[in-house]
Amino acid sequence: MKTPQNWQLLDSEYLFRYPWLTARRDHVRLPSGVEIPEYFVLEYPDWCNIIAITHSGQMIIEQQYRHAQGRVGYELPAGVIENGETPLEAARRELYEETGYGHGQWSHFMTISPNPGSCNNYSHTFLAIGVEPVSC
């Protein structure tokens, strides 16, 4: 099996920049020589997800309305990693902010690129076992 080769970036233009989403149009040349004059890339911040399990074995999930999907759904506690935070620091902060839970034994579960064909960010997932409600 051949090792994939990088594409050559010929030009890049930002279409818009917002704190939560930036879009750019790249002009690239593939290893075969074929050029793609409009390859769109979305730049999102990295985020973290938390699989949080209580001492009694219950998983902490939450319901939130998500406008892009037009519905209320269940999801894991999650959020954007702020500047200067490590992924673990962000995960601990997000779990507490969104659910009021904390403590427990934390471990890194995985880091993935959620949509590497068009997005440049990473999602860091943590497993927190033995979480409990935290008082202020």
Placement of each model-derived feature along the sequence:
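Short loop segments at secondary-structure junctions
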Residues: H27, S32-G33, T54-S56, Y65, ...
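Acidic, metal-coordinating catalytic segment for phosphate/diphosphate chemistry
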Residues: W7, D11-N49, H55
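Conserved hydrophobic/aromatic beta-strand scaffold that supports enzyme active sites
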Residues: A23-H27, I61, T125-L127
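Basic/polar N-terminal segments that are highly enriched at the extreme N-terminus
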Residues: M1-N6
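Residue-level structural signal for beta-strand termini and adjacent loop
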Residues: F40-V41, Y65, P114
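Unchanged
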Residues: P37, W47-N49, T54, G79-C136
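A glycine-rich, hydrophobic loop/mini-helix early in the fold
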Residues: Y44-E75
